[in-house]
């Protein structure tokens, strides 16, 4: 009898899975994307009116689906306390001084940045020293700071990693966390530096100066100041041209120092000039919110555990006008991801036979400011981190015709990889490797913050082979987006978009999530993975 009843349960779950997948609608996702990317929401800025509208829309939509609140005090919200730091570029100054030579830098034209001290006036007067890529890695036996005391100094460096074309150094073209700009600032602070300046080049950053300027030239939402953590007085960037002028004061060029930074025997180079100036900033308290919903599972033992679907709701708000448009709508980044998770929440809530485990649906704030919302949830989870079975994250999906493949960045590092392969087979999808490993996408989206606390987490993305299009269609579309729309006002919704790709991606992730929700064991990181030490 038990076997018979179990067979009925399995059959019901399988039937529910098929029904749920077929009910996922690209046109519903179109409607969500269109609204979230509308000018009415003013670019969904953190702590701004448009951001609050986005939060309320997401919560109200979850409620309309019958998804229960999973935030604080019986609400759909988890408040993330932050401090908004806005640099006054007109009153701030920055110059390089060597003897009687002085090179003044212009805000946004030559340099841009912020302060992590959260003080309104921060004087800067420090010796500059070049530290290559600013990496300290025991596993890679690489230390750009070896033999150098940078306490109280400003370190100058490049983002990315040394020798990216050499597979024997770090992971070759596949960027690791040590190559990310946020790591550079963290390591500089750990070393006691007063400031950190990244010399921007498009090849090392992976995007142009306009992306840096548009992202950094406005309010910077930061986590509330922790006096126990080191804080940079200045953290920022200079253009390649301005960086070249700075380096010329000491007889160096961008090209020669990029080459020097690739040398395994690299040692830091005193640049012989001082950075002098003052950063003038205004501060305000920000109470932005993660939006969280829950659908409970059917098994009394399993419902305390949850599969977590996520996407970030924020974008850049209003900023520097480009062709008389100052609204950074963020249609692809990331109204599309929110649309996928909303549609998955709707269908999951409608299932007659719920899976064993519960499901959480999360919409993070402040991803564009350094994954702040996901970072806060990881530190203050609304359910114990050990009970989060998996995090399936969506970020920046390109609407198009269906693709023949999918990219699931990071899943191969977990015990659910075989389930990913099976779900792809059932969806008639091939699994492709990351087409742009040099971008380090695993470390650039919210799931990374959950991985850091040991939760198996990865991003589900669209593939590169679009049905009915030339083989290079996807790569050309990405190149155009990265050059002309990414973090620009041009990232807007279009009526001619085909949402078949998002529909298929949502069904794939839905199937995968259901299978994990019904699995006997909780997923784990593979033995030896960098995140296995943080959790299961």
Regions found by a protein language model. Give the residues of each.
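Extracellular/luminal Protease-associated
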Residues: 23, 105-234, 296, 303, ...
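N-terminal capping segment at the start of a domain
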Residues: 23-49, 65, 69-71, 239, ...
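Acidic/His- and Gly-rich active-site-bordering loop/insert found
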Residues: 36, 239, 287-320
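Noncatalytic luminal/extracellular "stalk/propeptide" segments of secretory-pathway proteins
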Residues: 42-168, 269-272, 283, 287-290
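Metal-dependent peptidase/peptidase-like ectodomains
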Residues: 104-109, 120-121, 146, 223-226, ...
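Long, well-ordered, tryptophan-enriched scaffold segments
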Residues: 108, 190-203, 207, 215-216, ...
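Acidic/histidine-rich catalytic neighborhood of metal-dependent amide-processing enzymes
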Residues: 173-179, 187, 203-204, 317, ...
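His/Asp/Glu-rich mid-to-C-terminal helical/loop segments that flank catalytic regions of hydrolases
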Residues: 346, 350, 461-535
